[in-house]
A protein has these predicted regions:
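Structured C-terminal cap/extension of enzyme domains
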Residues: 545-594
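Catalytic domains of carbohydrate-active enzymes, especially glycoside hydrolases
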Residues: 89-113, 347-351, 528-530
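Conserved, well-ordered alpha-helix/loop/beta-strand core segments that scaffold catalytic motifs
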Residues: 252-286
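Hydrophobic alpha-helical membrane-insertion signals
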Residues: 22-26, 108-116
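Mature N-terminal, pre-catalytic/accessory segment of carbohydrate-active enzymes
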Residues: 1-75, 80-101
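Short acidic catalytic loops
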Residues: 102-109, 270, 278-284, 345-360
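Short, solvent-exposed loop/edge-beta patches enriched in aromatic
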Residues: 62, 89-106, 264, 268-278
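Alpha-amylase-like alpha-glycosidases and glucanotransferases acting on alpha-linked glucans and related
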Residues: 58-63, 70, 116-260, 286-535, ...
Length: 594
């Protein structure tokens, strides 16, 4: 094939693609030209099949079906935290859940965010996936802490808030952390941590220091808004800054070292509590296009963003504003940067979830100046990506879960199964052709099963139709669609109750007015626990009988995404009858280690 379409195809860029419903989308030449320019000169992408190589199998130990609890760490309340859940809360939760038989705690991405702009709080839009968010530090657990370092009136306000006040939390924690650092003699990160983290740690700490300087000067926390001379981390301006602010950069390295130490203690707390898997960490599909991970990094495509094509829910497609890894760089290196990323995360994890796992094969890319409706897919070296992933998984004995929702290419789930990557199966989506809920036995064994995720309503929210009301309120669906969905929801509830009855888990009526009774909620969780899926996760929000979503996709400031806190403390929630009823129901199907 000649012309721009042929050159694009040589690089793995698709001149056309099949969308949901089988529609063929032809990509504008202008998009192909911009993507070809962004990819740069290089060898043609080698042809490859959608298949798992036989030498790329992730760690998947034999053993009983396990269960655990999915937690949004920032949501946790306790008498001692600072208005946001922290690593010490995680230790305490591990002791409680491990004692009840849980084998893992699933967490939202803990990636490093923008400390100079803490209101940018989506954990799926991080500054850098290699490092951690210091706002999760339990400051009071760092040696040398003195309660006099904090403003108690401000602390009580943060602790009592219904929503996480990220700017307030960041101000309180960074002030105290600087005081601790000063009192301790302004230490750097430990030599061992610096050696393990390499030059990436230095670059990230430099970014955080420059970001604070730029934000204070009104240029914003992200590098794409900085003056031109500051956009090159290897330029003279940045070099002069690094020389003049060496202590400041050491402070940011020290923060990462402290976060790594506390996460390691949480991992050890899981082991002490008897958990077979321990921490289950989430890996975002990319990094913010203006974050430290893309600041002058040769393995990241510049001027290109990850998104999603048009579908039934988003007619114009989606722009996630995330920078992708370069397919050419992955092919040239055997996907070494991806492997290093995964190895770094897996060092503290017994399991990881890869967000948008289809990115191992292809990502939907959008060049600058183009809307998502004009984007297209680009292929990655699947064999190399899978081998790098499997190597990290086996080196660290870490189970891998792939989020395989949305537009999944035919054959991709078979690739996951062949590579020992667990599928991600959600009760709300596991339906038959008539809209009924499939029986537990129809779920695959190589899977993690759950009721819902952070992008979906809680069970109480779904039952009450709160998700429909919220989407209508914020204009995500029109009045006609809202009415149709509201009229359909009672039928969906009855279908679920019938599935429970068919499974021998419910002997009550089909029509249940008002909120679902606790025994029905327990029965639904037992239904999911009965599946042959290797792992089963229950959301802490469901255990707490919360009806609010933590994230409402396609909203920004309209809804407080990633900010709702649990209404009760960890001790109050885990001590409730509703919590115990659900845990008992799960353990009836998955007794595990007793």
């Amino acid at each position: 094939m000649d012309g721009i379409a042929g050159r694009a195809r040589d690089l793995g860029i698709q001149p056309e693609y099949e969308g949901i419903g089988g529609t063929i989308h032809r990509v504008p030449d202008s998009t192909l030209e911009k993507l070809v320019a962004a990819f740069g000169p290089g060898p043609a992408a080698r042809p490859q099949a959608l298949a798992a190589p036989p030498d790329a199998r992730c760690h998947l130990p034999d053993g009983p079906r396990s269960w655990g609890v999915a937690v949004q760490l920032y949501q946790l309340r306790s008498a001692r935290n600072w208005g946001i859940g922290d690593f010490a809360d995680l230790e305490d939760l591990a002791a409680i859940l491990g004692g009840m038989g849980a084998d893992f705690i699933g967490l939202n991405p803990l990636h490093a965010m923008f400390l100079a702009d803490p209101a940018r709080c989506s954990p799926f839009s991080p500054s850098n996936r290699r490092f951690l968010n210091p706002l999760y530090l339990a400051v009071d657990r760092i040696p040398g802490f003195d309660p006099a370092m904090i403003d108690m009136d401000g602390m009580e306000r943060l602790r009592g808030a219904d929503l996480v006040d990220y700017p307030g939390v960041a101000d309180a924690k960074l002030r105290a952390l600087r005081a601790l650092w000063d009192r301790s003699g302004q230490p750097d990160a430990s030599p061992g941590f610096r050696r393990r983290s390499g030059a990436d740690l230095d670059r990230h700490a430099l970014f955080d220091a420059v970001s604070a300087h730029m934000a204070a000067a009104g240029h914003g926390a992200g590098w794409t808004g900085w003056p031109e001379a500051w956009r090159d981390p290897d330029g003279a301006k940045v070099a002069d800054f690094a020389h003049a602010h060496a202590a400041e950069i050491a402070f940011y390295r020290w923060l990462q070292d402290q976060a790594d130490l506390q996460l390691a203690r949480a991992r050890d707390a899981c082991r002490t509590a008897g958990m077979a898997i321990g921490l289950y960490l989430d890996v975002a599909v990319g990094e913010a296009a203006d974050g430290s991970g893309s600041w002058g990094h040769p393995d990241v495509l510049s001027g290109v963003r990850i998104g999603a094509p048009p579908d039934y829910f988003n007619e114009g497609g989606q722009d996630w504003a995330l920078a992708p890894l370069s397919p050419a760089a992955m092919a040239a290196s055997g996907a070494a940067p991806f492997g290093a990323l995964m190895a770094g995360v897996m060092a503290r994890a017994g399991a990881v979830r890869i967000d948008h796992a289809m990115g191992l094969w292809q990502l939907f890319l959008i060049p600058e100046g183009v809307g998502p409706d004009a984007g297209t897919y680009a292929r990655y070296p699947l064999d190399d990506m899978l081998r790098a992933l499997a190597q990290a998984s086996n080196d660290h004995d870490t189970i891998v879960i792939g989020e395989d929702l949305g537009n999944v290419p035919p054959g991709f789930r078979e690739v996951m199964e062949g590579a020992n990557i667990l599928s991600y199966r959600i009760l709300f989506f596991e339906r038959d052709a008539d809209g009924g809920f499939v029986p537990p036995g129809d779920y695959p064994a190589k899977a993690l099963a759950c009721l819902s995720t952070h992008d979906l309503p809680t069970f109480l929210g779904w039952w009450g139709g709160h998700d429909i009301a919220l989407r209508a309120r914020f204009g995500l669906i029109g009045a006609d669609a809202a009415r149709e969905q509201s009229e359909a929801r009672p039928g969906e509830r009855r279908a679920l109750v019938r599935a429970l009855r068919d499974a021998g888990l419910w002997d009550g009526g089909d029509d249940i007015p008002g909120p679902p009774p606790p025994d029905l909620v327990a029965a639904v969780h037992r239904f999911v626990a009965r599946t042959p899926a290797r792992l089963m996760a229950v959301r802490l929000e469901d255990l707490a009988r919360d009806d609010r979503p933590v994230n409402l996709p396609s909203t920004a400031d309209e809804y407080p995404n990633w900010r709702p806190r649990l209404r009760g403390t960890v001790d109050e929630i885990t001590g409730s009858d509703a919590f115990r009823a659900i845990i008992d129901a799960i353990r009836a199907e998955r007794p595990g280690r007793g």
